[in-house]
Amino acid sequence: MVAKLEQLIAQTILQGFDAQYGRFLEVTAGAQHRFEQADWHAVQQAMKKRIHLYDHHVGLVVEQLKYITDQRHFDVEFLARVKEIYTGLLPDYPRFEIAESFFNSVYCRLFKHRDLTPDKLFVFSSQPERRFREIPRPLARDFIPKGDLSGMLQMVLNDLSLRLPWENLSRDIDYIVMAIRQAFTDEQLASAHFQIANELFYRNKAAWLVGKLRLNGDIYPFLLPIHHNESGELFIDTCLTSKAEASIVFGFARSYFMVYVPLPAAMVEWLREILPGKSTAELYTAIGCQKHGKTESYREYLAFIHQSSEQFIIAPGVKGMVMLVFTLPSFDRVFKVIKDQFAPQKEVTQARVLECYQLVKEHDRVGRMADTQEYENFVIDKHRISPELLAELQHEVPEKLEDLGDKIVIKHLYMERRMTPLNLYMEQADDQQLKDAIEEYGNAIKQLAAANIFPGDMLFKNFGVTRHGRVVFYDYDEICYMTEVNFRDIPPPRYPEDEMASEPWYSVSPNDVFPEEFRHFLCSDRKVRHFFEEMHGDLFQASYWRGLQQRIRDGHVEDVFAYRRKQRFSQRALN
């Protein structure tokens, strides 16, 4: 009877995963229709819905198992046998690696994230040699120009499944040919071989054609973002052929793509050639398998810990008033723990901080907010923690610590991509770098605001600079929707003495924001003030912010470009 129960539990979990991934594919398959209908609000809702599917189905399976087992507690041997039986169901299973993550999630939900050991759940994959094997159905089609690049592109684009007419396809093809010829020599292009993914990658208001360009043994990305105009006609906005550009398109600060992937491991392996700087975790996350991306992130962390003797240290930069942040000197991620007590000037609660981080997970991050992975009962060997960090942990987060003697358990933390704090970057920057950083910072604020996100605390220390020089927001404890804020002009003083008073001469409500004050705390440095006024002086005007609010209330969804505006074909035509 017990053996049958173990079998039933294993099969119930796998069937639950089948149901979840089926719904995942169903929501994803609707991306083309939403794009063709220009139903951008439905795009946003589908993104949130797909993110919630995973936890919803984990919850359904957990309730089933509680009913099946009558909520009995099982010993270690029983749980190990369930995992063994589950593993035996996976050898011919097409998505076994994500099924392993689903098993982990069910286990963690049942046992409150306790006893996370390899004998009970899939800390490591059961079949690492099978993860990126050959697949029966090709993911891409091959095209060779044979001296007629324009003709080949015509064939590629006419072969797409999109059912809308083109605005001016021959014009767009001319632009693509021009971009390719500017990027590569005739000698390189003589051996050109294109591989075009069968499925389009949908995100925001664009459908991306994703391909590879093979030239004399070298491989380059070939990315075409397809948009529509107001008449419902298609146009291609640019052509990207560098790995740095592709890395930004698939960046950790962007929403997940909607791409139909019955075999995600195969897609991850296919993408790896054009995104060599992306980890396995980042690639799974980019195509919407963010929960498995979390599993892979943890495995990458374990691999680093195993190969390194570094100690965890307090992260460089200004210490936060809400979060304690630490890292490993050579690791590309940071760890963030919500403090037990906040600084007096922070009027937020622990629950509100958790809500803010969840909001960021579900919202369109427009390339300006870092994605995070959330972990519970995170175990660290005590000897790997520097004395300074250990003291900081014991002082700032004692309620979230459990001391096991040789190990420390942190009950809740976030893992996030490591960046250079913007304030530290600006201190070391030359004039051109400083100007570029201010331009990026202002663009980040404006793009977040257009996506209905107000950062709250806009100090430079709350932003980071990526390896591609992009500025990304990463301090979420004060974020809110733009539509919740009351942007006000500062009233003129009643008397000359008003300006000298320590208290304002006007009333201030909790949601009031005075953009004129931004100049005071952002522009104390003369050079910074000059660059800011030159490029983003409108951020100091309440009317600018109110105008954005009105566009949001009117239902307008802004375009989000994963490349600079000057790279758009429409901008080239103007120049």
Swiss-Prot record:
One of its GO terms (molecular function) is phosphoprotein phosphatase activity. The active site is at residue 371. It is found in: Cytoplasm. Pfam families: AceK_kinase, AceK_regulatory. The keyword Manganese does not apply. Its EC number is 2.7.11.5, 3.1.3.-. It catalyses: L-seryl-[isocitrate dehydrogenase] + ATP = O-phospho-L-seryl-[isocitrate dehydrogenase] + ADP + H(+). One of its GO terms (cellular component) is cytoplasm. ATP binds at residues 315-321, 336. Belongs to the AceK family. Bifunctional enzyme which can phosphorylate or dephosphorylate isocitrate dehydrogenase (IDH) on a specific serine residue. This is a regulatory mechanism which enables bacteria to bypass the Krebs cycle via the glyoxylate shunt in response to the source of carbon. When bacteria are grown on glucose, IDH is fully active and unphosphorylated, but when grown on acetate or ethanol, the activity of IDH declines drastically concomitant with its phosphorylation. NCBIfam families: PRK02946.1. This is Isocitrate dehydrogenase kinase/phosphatase. The lineage of its organism: Bacteria, Pseudomonadati, Pseudomonadota, Gammaproteobacteria, Enterobacterales.
